[in-house]
Regions:
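Active-site nucleophile-His-acid catalytic modules used for acyl/amide transfer and hydrolysis
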Residues: 111-175
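Activation targets extended, charge/polar-rich intrinsically disordered C-terminal tails
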Residues: 146, 150-223
């Protein structure tokens, strides 16, 4: 009889342990996005750190402005009906409104970090109009040529246009020169050759590193 009670106790203890573990996992999954979003404010800009290779590395090689961090993607945060979203233009999906949790998962899967930047107080009034403009540009395809047009957008282009009315960011002459060699970066030479296009050196454009360097922004921290 005593042995039977001990076996029942051990069995129940094991079930209880599994149940507690399962509840803890659920709580962690629920609380993580809450902790992350607690840092955010409507209109914050999320910058994604650059990779060292491929398209990401090629963009960074000719645009990096900061030693401590470099970026290859950007989106703007919007809170709607108690849910957080990221409005951004990406190669997969074009201009889109993505749930924050999904956006962060995508970056985590690529081992990229997400940094929060915020408009300084004197520029915060630009956010409502910028979000409205960003919403109006949803659904457009991604601009794979990185040459400005009205029918497709790349990531920093999408954000610059969102704030263009208030001149928060500015277009600058693009460069595809590798600072190490003083010559056009090999990646970009091949990139535009395959598209039968001339490298758009000097044409107006923007990039995540240029936007992050704006004196109208302040860095909040990592998300």
């Amino acid at each position: 009889m005593i042995k039977l009670k001990e076996e029942l106790f051990q069995k129940n203890h094991k079930i209880l342990t599994y149940a507690i573990f399962f509840v803890v996992i659920l709580l962690l999954e629920y609380c993580a996005p809450q902790v992350q979003s607690a840092k955010l404010k409507n209109g914050d800009l999320l910058f994604v750190t650059a990779k060292e290779t491929g398209l990401s590395g090629a963009i960074n090689n000719v645009t990096q402005k900061q030693k401590e961090a470099s970026f290859d993607h950007i989106g703007i945060v919007e809170k709607a009906e108690n849910h957080w979203y990221v409005l951004h233009a990406a190669p997969k999906g074009g201009s889109q409104k993505q749930e924050l949790k999904s956006f962060l998962t995508d970056q985590s899967d690529e081992d990229q970090k997400v940094m929060i930047y915020r408009l300084k107080p004197e520029y915060q009034r630009s956010i409502p109009a910028a979000l409205k403009k960003a919403e109006s540009m949803l659904g457009k395809p991604y601009n794979f040529n990185y040459i400005l047009d009205e029918n497709s957008y790349y990531c920093s282009d999408y954000i610059e246009r969102s704030f263009r009315k208030d001149h928060i960011f500015k277009l600058e002459p693009m460069t595809f020169i590798d600072p190490k060699t003083g010559e056009t970066n090999t990646f970009w030479m091949e990139f535009y050759k395959k598209k039968n296009l001339k490298v758009p050196e000097g044409e107006p454009g923007c990039n995540p590193n240029g936007l992050a360097a704006s004196d109208k922004l302040e860095k909040i921290g990592e998300l």
